Amino acid sequence: MVLVCASSSKCKRNTFLQLAMVLFAVVMARIALYFHNHLDEPLVDPYDANGNPQFSEANALKHVIHLSDDIGYRILGTIEQERAREYIMNEVLALQKQLQDGPNADIHQMEVSLESGDGAHRFDFMNKYVIKKYQNLKNIVVRLSNGTEACKEEAVLINAHVDSTLPSPGATDDALAVAILLEAIRIFISRPVPLTHSIVFLFNDAEESLQDASHMFITQSPLRDTIKCVVNLEACGTTGSEILFQATSNEMIKAYSHVPHPFGTVLADDVFRTGLILSDTDFRQFVQYGNLTGLDMAVVKNSYLYHTKKDLAPYISPGTPQNFGENILAILTYLVSPEADLNNMKSSGTVYFSVFNSLFFMYSKLTSKILNTLVGGLGILLTLRGSEGSFTVALIAQVISIAGIFVIPNIWAYILGNVLDCGMSWFRNEYWPLFIYLPAIFASLFFTESLFKRSEHLALRATIFIFSLLTFIPLPSAYLFTIIDFFMVFALFLNDKILAKPGTVHPLTYFIGSIGAMTVGFESAINLLEIFVPLTGRIGTDKVADNVVATVCVCGFNIYFPLMSPWIQRFRSRCCFRLGLLFSIFVVGFSSFILAKQDTYYDSLHPRRIFVQRMENITSNEVSLHIASADSAPGFDKLSSDLSSLLTDEPVVKTEMDDWNSDWDTVYPFSQFLGSYRIPLNDTVDVTTLPSIKFSNKVVKDNVVNVTVTVEHPGLIWTVVSFDADVLSWSLPEVPSTVRRHHVREVSAYGLDSYSFNMSYLEAPIYFDFVGVDGVGHYPSKASEGRDRASIQLCEKLTNDYLPDWTDTLCIGVVSGNFKLE
């Protein structure tokens, strides 16, 4: 994107330097991408040539395939979840017998238990409160120790969840983690090395229902008080290395430092804590209720298939299970050794990051402050030394330049999404946004840099001064600015002392000054793109996706090309600036036009998520179809209208999604991100066994009512009751006193169909809204068993005949009703 002006002798003289810098940037990016995407060859044999046990991807995939392909959709409350649990228990018991019959029976002790229980907890998400109630959940718990009480009293917990969510068979989320745990058990019992600390393997029953089974374990398990730390395994992608995105103690980060394929950064930790990812894991329950520290790790690349029907074993990239499994083995091997101090698990602000998936660095919060202060302080001193009034002007110009590359691309992003209605045209590829927003950034640079006449050296000093200030940001992820700034400060020092004449910049300064940016900085920029571009397909219908991605591109550009402003000033000429600006604008327009004119912004491997439910209301006797989307790309309104015209003569109705619209309460609080339409159907309600809400033991005293509420939901799963009331107390977790709208989501094991809670509230009529998913009315998981259901028939028809192949549909039958408590 750096232009050569043919009519300018200055541009001609510097053509070689321009090309050299471009080549340097490309080569560095190519090297970084190679290591970023590199995965070792998967292993097949469970033992190496010397007979030592090793992680076998082939073994792990057998478990993944059985759970996700053979058993399929492991939805809590269905028979498939019971079958998955039975399969895992059989595998665990077989491993236990293998240990008992093998040569290591006197070295290891393996205890297996099935822990069940009921409970409730409050789940807060994006300023929403939901009460979770669960019944008869069953966790498979395996403790591996040397048989002594001392070993058992200091345990490492490693967690994976067995269930999957609608509408996903959950190969990576989270059958892969389950398979890794099974492989880890096999390997540890095959090693003739006694454990100093025990390992508790938790195959938890319910994560997708908002982390119920992990809550049950950490609040009810007999082993909970022995747990000293936790390693949580998750996935939202299908390819690449798993990332360490939460690490909360120095000792656990030290454990991670032993992995053969490190890929983690405290920057991911800081981003995750902002809530921008709109996701959470079981790790939250272990921290909140167990006061544990630990590691949270997940496969995140290619999250286009997250929670879709294509989360299947064939889409897991070869090498991903091997990479993940070997890293987990290294972590556990350290944690069960005498070297690990499990009594030193205090939370810390340790800074950590990896480079090229090969090198791992960690240092304390104090060390971080010292390094940041030294590098930043030195940078400020060097840039301010001998400063004159012109530096102030250069600094103001640099601030305006940085502001420009944030503002101008975001203005264009707003126009694309909100004016031209062609937002998210780049969705199918994590790197396609660069075709639009990279030239927009250069256009901004050429424009703003042309406004101020400043020397190249002053522009360099101003750039380094600003990056030096960034090192003082009070976040662990400020390490990134420190590394980038270190090389720039070092380059400036060499330039001023050795390489160049006073007030000039030697070309080598740019190459030296860009080393940090084009290594650690590039990895960070790529990670942001790979996380946020697929994420825009599920962040809601507000038209902000292009602005989010434009901002990510700008941040990535500043991280990778921090010295672009002085570099442009090096070739300053009116001709170069004009041509650069015009060419950049042309590329922006051309790229935007080409991408916008695609027939669709999606394909089968990068699908649009569509949420469909056929709702039968037993109170109004109305049947309706609800169709919703979770992204802001164009076309959904037309898709809904076309669908309506195929099914009925009734007009489609746009519904307002708020806390008082219970249509999508089955996915509350995620429902707040949906844009939904309601299509009335000319069908009759055909619910064989009606749900009900019954009220008993009612006592009224001094305007306060005490009552027992019993919800009966035969044949329905994932039920929700929502209502407005001034609740004074109840047998459920407390909510803030300012909250009047309450949502109680209930899940239970297969076969249970009722639950109760006691409530005390200020006397006034209460209107309960009830919704529940038909236990055999979700498609395609129950396509065969529920083929006589109208919801299954409709879902099948929609999927096969109406909806494009670039959609991925959650399609369910829902029963709703309204009940009044006088």
UniProtKB/Swiss-Prot annotation:
Keywords: Endoplasmic reticulum, Glycoprotein, Hydrolase, Membrane, Metal-binding, Metalloprotease, Protease, Transmembrane, Transmembrane helix, Zinc. Zn(2+) 1 binds at residues 161, 173, 234. Binds 2 Zn(2+) ions per subunit. Its main location: endoplasmic reticulum. Disulfide bonds: none annotated. One of its GO terms (cellular component) is endoplasmic reticulum membrane. GO terms for molecular function: metal ion binding; metalloexopeptidase activity. Glycans are attached at residues 146, 291, 617, 682, 706, 758. It holds the Pfam family Peptidase_M28. GO terms for biological process: endoplasmic reticulum unfolded protein response; proteolysis. Its cofactor is Zn(2+). Its EC number is 3.4.-.-. PANTHER family: ENDOPLASMIC RETICULUM METALLOPEPTIDASE 1 (PTHR12147:SF22), METALLOPEPTIDASE M28 FAMILY MEMBER (PTHR12147). Belongs to the peptidase M28 family. M28B subfamily. This is Putative endoplasmic reticulum metallopeptidase 1. It comes from Schizosaccharomyces pombe (strain 972 / ATCC 24843) (Fission yeast). The gene is erm1.
